A protein has these predicted regions:
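Generic secretory/membrane-interface signal
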Residues: 4-6, 15, 170, 342, ...
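C-terminal auxiliary extensions adjacent to catalytic cores
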Residues: 23-45, 49-56, 60-68, 72, ...
């Protein structure tokens, strides 16, 4: 997975013992790459906060205090949230008295508690950490209005391996408010967390890690709970897994085409030039590279003039899947380097329209310590990511479809000129006859999972929250499609390697390309030739391991 954003990492060395410490990745709110986020989530890198970014957070927090003192109605600060936006929390009258500050603290504590209402099993620890990485970086844009201590605790949780238990279900994709709130619950010393692999209470985790509990006020609770970082963590994982399947496709396809003794005509540059869709030229070149040096480039009068359609059009599926994954990575990179806060706390707000509109002017705060604007927004809506996920799911399902059909054809002696079901000549049993149901089952599930989900839902919260993206569901669906397609590719490779072995008996001088030979050899180390019927379950699982490591 590539990204053009600059890398801001520093690596220290333990010279005395000759061991390298984990890299320290410095977050500044604008330059985090997807690979860096994953590296931190896996515990392969520590986190530092860029001093300039923390100063920006401090200034933004000062703006929130100025707004609170002014008594202006600010969502989640001086008035409630959701349908309770019309309920005043306190009256400051220009002063942040102890009573005002206490009212703010009570609102924040209660908001974190009342919104901790998730369902299901806990998120995998790596994904929970990934969600915290994402939220920390978006906090550092300085647009949440949270106090700097919130950002520091996110950092400390990551570096000291305090991972709040976050339920894995209960979000409709307009900020993961019922899930992300569990992070805040641990910050205040409540709920539960994993500390260095051990499940403990939030209070125990903070004490063991040497972290002082957060005393939330102002916009702290809203900043912690109202964001999409939890669902985005699942989306990043799904994108990574889709990328792996896409990267494997040219070689898996190439090995199957060799097993078929198929025709390279559909991926020739002359053919592709006649219909220059985006990325099609590049995808065809990848397929040709995967077959370079193969006997398929040599004349063979026994070869069919035209192969079954799926062998001929997989190049289109690859081109579209690559585009979809790239677009998904692009929107995810924007998502993890920008604010999804509502309202947005803007130190850099332009004066545009302010003089012309009393409504716009009312959002501005001209305080003694900070100047800027706190403006209601719809930035919590992650529709670009949800749509990109669903497009990728559909593209991946097409790859799944092509692979299933190719595998079926490899079992058909009419197309291969080999034995039916790729049966060894001495085998009087089933060979690959029954196994077809396994990859068909995977593909049928993929067909279901590829259906759009972002329009499903009903208005909630007194009808004011009347839209949804189901971002987490879209991400989980793609992840499942990725997993299923990898299983299908394992089954296809099982068939392709068997076809190659049978073809080499028939045509000993048949040559594989270097890339397909590498895959063939890796697969054969774990999955032997099928001479007689055997249990195939372990073969399928071992094939997946080979492909994941390839």
């Amino acid at each position: 997975m590539t990204n053009s954003f600059k890398l801001t990492a520093t690596v220290s060395m333990l010279m005395a013992c000759g061991l390298a410490q984990a890299a320290t990745i410095t977050l500044d709110g604008s330059n985090l790459t997807l690979d860096q986020a994953w590296e931190i989530a896996r515990g392969d890198a520590d986190v530092a906060i860029a001093p300039a970014a923390l100063k920006h957070v401090e200034k933004s927090y000062q703006l929130v205090l100025e707004a609170a003192a002014s008594g202006k109605p600010v969502y989640g600060l001086t008035v409630g949230v959701g349908l309770n936006k019309d309920k005043k929390l306190f009256t400051a009258d220009g002063k942040l008295t102890p009573e005002v500050l206490q009212a703010s603290r009570e609102f924040n504590y209660n908001a974190l508690r009342a919104h901790s209402a998730g369902i299901g099993e806990a998120m995998p620890e790596t994904l929970a950490r990934l969600a915290m990485v994402v939220r920390l970086n978006t906090l550092l844009t300085g647009r949440s209005g949270a106090q700097p201590r919130v950002a520091e605790i996110y950092r400390d949780f990551l570096n000291k391996h305090v991972t709040p238990v976050i339920p894995s279900e209960g979000t409709i994709g307009e900020a993961d408010i019922l899930l992300a709130s569990h992070v805040g619950s641990v910050m205040i010393g409540e709920w539960r967390a994993n500390y260095k692999g051990k499940l403990v209470s939030g209070k125990e985790a903070l004490k063991a890690a040497g972290i002082q509990p957060l005393v939330p006020s102002g916009k702290d609770a809203l900043a912690i709970l109202s964001n999409n970082a939890v669902a985005v963590a699942y989306a990043i994982e799904a994108a990574r897994n889709a990328q792996k399947v896409v990267q494997l496709t040219p070689t898996v396809y190439g090995l199957s085409l060799e097993g078929l003794n198929g025709n390279i005509a559909p991926i020739l540059p002359q053919t592709i030039a006649a219909r220059p869709f985006p990325n099609l030229k590049e995808a065809a070149a990848e397929m040709r590279d995967a077959l370079k040096g193969s006997s398929l480039f040599d004349e063979d009068k026994s070869r069919a003039l035209q192969d079954p359609l799926t062998f001929r059009v997989t190049v289109f599926g690859l081109a579209e899947a690559e585009r979809a994954v790239k677009d998904l990575n692009d929107v995810l990179t924007v998502q993890i380097n920008s604010s999804d806060d509502n309202p947005a706390t803007l130190l850099d707000a332009t004066e545009e329209l302010r003089a012309e509109s009393t409504r716009v002017d009312n959002y501005f705060i001209d305080g003694k310590e900070a100047k800027g604007a706190i403006i209601p927004s719809g930035n919590f809506n992650p529709l670009p990511v949800a749509l990109a996920l669903q497009r990728t799911s559909l593209a991946m399902a097409h790859l799944s479809h092509y692979a299933v059909q190719r595998t079926l054809h490899l079992s058909d002696d009419h197309f291969t000129g080999l034995s039916r079901f790729l049966t060894d000549p001495t085998n009087k049993g089933h060979a690959f006859g029954a196994i077809q149901k396994a990859y068909m089952a995977m593909h049928v599930e993929n067909m279901s999972l590829a259906n759009p989900v972002s329009l499903f839902g009903m208005p909630v919260a007194g009808d004011i929250e009347d839209t949804f993206t189901n971002l987490m569901l879209a991400a989980k669906n793609l992840n499942r499609i990725d997993r299923n397609t990898m299983q299908i590719y394992s089954l296809e490779t099982l068939h392709a390697t068997q076809a190659i072995d049978l073809r080499l008996v028939k045509t000993p001088d048949f040559k594989l390309s270097a890339p397909t030979k590498k895959l063939y050899d890796a697969f054969r180390k774990e999955v032997p030739y099928v001479k007689a019927d055997r249990q195939f379950t372990d073969d399928i699982a071992n094939g997946v391991k080979v492909l994941e490591a390839f």
